[in-house]
Amino acid sequence: MEHRGTSPLLLALALLSALCWRARALPPRGAAFPAVPRLGNRLPFDAASESDRAHGSLKSESDILQNTLPENEKFYFDLSRIIDRNDRHADGIFTTVYSHLLAKLAVKRYLHSLIRKRVSSQDSPVKRHSDAVFTDNYSRFRKQMAVKKYLNSVLTGKRSQEELNPAKLADEAEILEPSFSENYDDVSVDELLSHLPLDL
């Protein structure tokens, strides 16, 4: 039952506060508005010369309004001026804080972009290194297969015309010279390969 009683109470309190808020902007109850000049009621004109009117200083609208207000309404005018000043001050604070926040975000984005560029540029040497390692291993494997094929052809006595090329034989001789003896009759291919320094 208490829950049902609090909802109308809260609603009434909200309505009352809204009405009080709106009523604060109204003039006091007994205050009269300044008299509006009508056609029959002319304001006295102090006769200023033509040059005085041309060079006369213009008053701001707020000064004119404040001079025409009765004494009991000047408080509300000053209050509205203070509220406007506070609004401008709050807007200025918000603008300052917001601009600092945007500057920080811009710096953060810039740093992230620099870090991304640095990381992406560091990936390239690693990739190039892994490509070089693969190429090196693959070329060693191809050399081993060429040596194995050559040794098989030498041991079996079958040599193609391509293998009899003197330039190629000189290259292959440089590869085989340091680790093998001159007698190949009783050596198998597997024994020859076991003596080769093959690093994979």
UniProtKB/Swiss-Prot annotation:
<feature type="propeptide">
    <location>
        <begin position="160"/>
        <end position="200"/>
    </location>
</feature>
<dbReference type="GO" id="GO:0007189">
    <property type="term" value="P:adenylate cyclase-activating G protein-coupled receptor signaling pathway"/>
</dbReference>
<dbReference type="GO" id="GO:0031891">
    <property type="term" value="F:type 1 vasoactive intestinal polypeptide receptor binding"/>
</dbReference>
<comment type="similarity">
    <text>Belongs to the glucagon family.</text>
</comment>
<keyword id="KW-0964">Secreted</keyword>
<feature type="modified residue" description="Threonine amide">
    <location>
        <position position="156"/>
    </location>
</feature>
<comment type="function">
    <text>PHM-27 is a bioactive form from proteolysis of the same precursor protein, that causes vasodilation.</text>
</comment>
<keyword id="KW-0165">Cleavage on pair of basic residues</keyword>
<dbReference type="GO" id="GO:0048242">
    <property type="term" value="P:epinephrine secretion"/>
</dbReference>
<feature type="propeptide">
    <location>
        <begin position="26"/>
        <end position="87"/>
    </location>
</feature>
<dbReference type="InterPro" id="IPR000532">
    <property type="entry name" value="Glucagon_GIP_secretin_VIP"/>
</dbReference>
<dbReference type="GO" id="GO:0009648">
    <property type="term" value="P:photoperiodism"/>
</dbReference>
<keyword id="KW-0732">Signal</keyword>
<dbReference type="InterPro" id="IPR046963">
    <property type="entry name" value="VIP/GHRH-like"/>
</dbReference>
<dbReference type="GO" id="GO:0005576">
    <property type="term" value="C:extracellular region"/>
</dbReference>
<dbReference type="Pfam" id="PF00123">
    <property type="entry name" value="Hormone_2"/>
</dbReference>
<dbReference type="GO" id="GO:0043005">
    <property type="term" value="C:neuron projection"/>
</dbReference>
<keyword id="KW-0027">Amidation</keyword>
<dbReference type="GO" id="GO:0005184">
    <property type="term" value="F:neuropeptide hormone activity"/>
</dbReference>
<dbReference type="GO" id="GO:0051428">
    <property type="term" value="F:peptide hormone receptor binding"/>
</dbReference>
<keyword id="KW-0372">Hormone</keyword>
<feature type="signal peptide">
    <location>
        <begin position="1"/>
        <end position="25"/>
    </location>
</feature>
<protein>
    <recommendedName>
        <fullName>VIP peptides</fullName>
    </recommendedName>
</protein>
<dbReference type="GO" id="GO:0032880">
    <property type="term" value="P:regulation of protein localization"/>
</dbReference>
<feature type="propeptide">
    <location>
        <begin position="119"/>
        <end position="126"/>
    </location>
</feature>
